[in-house]
Amino acid sequence: MKDAGNRAKHGVSLTLAAELDWDAALVWVDDRFAYAEFRMIALAPTTGILYYVAFVDRASVRRIISLRRANRREVKHYVESI
């Protein structure tokens, strides 16, 4: 259900997160709101495309909340930060 919603909204399956290059990801804490859990944001590449992903790490499991292609501003931020 969550995956179907993400595909409808962003055109990307949450399962794509398994293919992201997490070692090359730019990761930071998502502190925009007072979430009930410790959320993270990442800009992570795969096959020449940069993705914006919101996630939570729970023990040894990474739960993907949202995944979409990064916009121009986010790509610029990633390039300037690496």
Could you describe each region identified by the protein language model?
Residues 1-82:
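Ribonuclease/tRNase effector modules and their secretory precursors
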